[in-house]
Amino acid sequence: MDSEKIFNALNQIKISIDQHKDEIEKLDQEIGDGDHIFNIQRGIKESLDLKDELSGKAPNEVLKKIGMKIMTTVGGSSGALFSTLIMGMSKKYNDELSDQKNIAVMFTEGVEAMKKRGKSDLGEKTMLDV
């Protein structure tokens, strides 16, 4: 795993979010104020803008910086929760593991950090269930 793979994955997330923009916006308008899509798009764009600065850096450092960028650019509770997920992932990177194993371990840690911060768990109709 390296910074290039992380930014490639983030770009794929951006593409998927852009493809489902209308659906995401509609869902947010039904339960919120409808601005989630704009906030998350801004956060991802600004995170992708870090690519040159973070090129060649260790994956845990890249994830931590992306998490901090999400925290400062995505409003509301979703910014805090997504940044917690990503920064939680950064704490478990181990360069001795395969990419697949690292992703599994890191994502599990990120989800646990998000559950703790949001004081929620699966099945409670939160972001974790989506």
Task: List each model region and its residues.
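N-terminal loops that bind phosphate or other acidic moieties
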Residues: 1-130
